[in-house]
C-alpha cells in the first residue's frame, strides 16, 4: 500500500474502508514506483458540517496497453464523510479531479450542479473520489487506452486503502473508463452508471475526431497549434450539441463585417475555442481524443449491474449503440433514455433528471426515495 505523507495543514489520513484484500488479474501487473505520496488533507472542526477533503498525488508504474511500462503520476481528490460508501466520478476528456466547490477547495468544479446537499452525490452521505485522467497534463506523449485509465484507478484505490467502490459514475469518456473498470476490476465495483458512453467509438464520431486532430496538425505546421486546437474545439461543439439548440439560440440573420459574412453562432464558437485553449495542453487533447477512438470492450465482460443512460439526438454516442450495449450486458444492464436539446452535453445540463437516475442507481440498503 502507498503511505500517505500529509502536508503541514490539519490532517487525518484517509481511513481504510475495508480490510480485505481484493485480488484482480489486471491489477497484479500494477506496482507502485514510490512508497510515498503527498496529500493535502482537511479535517473540519467538530462543530462544522463540512465533510473531510483530501487532494493528493502518487506515482505508479503501469504497464500500458500500447506504450509499455511507464512511470505515471496520479492526482486525485477525495471528499466526503469518512466510512461513507465511495463513489468514483469521471467525466469527459476535459474533466478533472475537482468535482465541486467544498469548504477547503472552494473553486468551482466541473460537475457543480450534481454534487451537494440532497443530491445523489452528496458528500454528507457519499465519499466522492475523482482523478485527473492519465495524459491530462500533456506530459504523456503515447497512446492511452481506457484500460490504462481503469488500471490506474485500481492502483489509486489500493493506495487509499479502498477495497471496493459502491459506485462508478461515468459521463462521456468517463463512461468508457467505467465500462473498462467494470470489465477488468469487477470485484472492486458494486454498480456502474454509464452516461453517454458505449462499448466502442461510433465510426461517425471517430471521423469527427479525426478531422479535429487534423485541424490541430495543420495549426502545428503553421506554428500556430493553439489556433488549430481552438478550431478543433469549435468543431467539437457542433457534435456535442444539436441542430435544435442552435436553431433556438442562433437564429439571427448574418452580419457583414469588413466585407465578410459572420453568422450568429460564431461569437459562441470563438469563446468556446478560446476557453478550451486556455486550460488544455495540445498534447493532452490529441492523446485523449485518440483514447476515445481506441476504446473497445466486450459488453459481456462487464460483470456488475450497469445503468446505461442515452440521450436521443446525441450525435457522438447514438441511441442505437447504447441499445446494443445494454443487449450485450444481458440481465446486468438497464437503459434510461433522455430527450434533450443538449445532445451529448445533456449530462451537464439536465441536472435534475440525471440526479434522479443516480439517486435510484446508487441507493444503498435501507435508503428510501
Swiss-Prot record:
Region named Disordered: 1-21
Compartments where found: Cytoplasm
Domain AB hydrolase-1, first and last residues per copy: 86-350
Top-tier EC class: transferase
Site (Important for substrate specificity) residue list: 173
Chain positions of site Important for acyl-CoA specificity: 209
Family to which the UniProt record says this protein belongs: Belongs to the AB hydrolase superfamily. MetX family.
Self-association state and partner proteins as the record states: Homodimer.
Known function: Transfers a succinyl group from succinyl-CoA to L-homoserine, forming succinyl-L-homoserine.
Protein name, as recorded: Homoserine O-succinyltransferase
